[in-house]
Amino acid sequence: MADLKTRIAKRCAKEFQDGDFVNLGIGLPTQVADYIPDDIIVTFHSENGFAGIDAVATENPDVDIINSGGTYVTAVPRVKYFDTAESFGLVRGGHVKATVLGAMEVAENGDLANWIIPGKKVAGMGGAMDLCAGCPEVIIVMLHTQKGTPKIKKKCSLPLTAEKCVSKIITEMGVMEVREDGIWVTELHPDYTKEDIQAATECELHFDPNMKAMEEE
């Protein structure tokens, strides 16, 4: 399981270019910062109030540096700290290029459900609703299924975070773009066939004529 999540995080890291300002959600998205190439600078934003997230802290963490999910993280030397109002002003003002989020379900039209399973206690919506509305790109990183049940649906069954917001989905099986006419597979991991990824997906997938092999490195 860990290797599959690493695969997803490594591939997501390839989405960004030098100078990008990107929000990282909690969970799997935090791993993306670990795999940014050394020759580019990508500034990662955390909505609890800082820009300059680096890798997750594994030893002797600074207890004053946590991300929005409460995980200890490290910070780059150029880190900037600010209050929550300014943080969400950056998001709502469209100054954050993309957000990387996890998901429970994604619908074929780009609807996202990632904040609650009815009947289970959660802390609250968090910043996901604002991020989905304010960021030009919403990239979902997740395992393709949950205990064999497809997470990419015809229609979400869980309460929505936002409607028609997802632009790209990256799973262990491939990379998919959400377009007006559905979900298109643009990269397929060599471990899987077209039939495999379709069988693990509830909605119909479309395969881009220029589809290539999913690369991790």
PLM region descriptions:
Residues 1-76:
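N-terminal active-site beta-alpha-beta segment that forms phosphate/nucleotide-binding
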Residues 3-7, 58-217:
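Conserved phosphate- and dinucleotide-binding cores of soluble alpha/beta proteins
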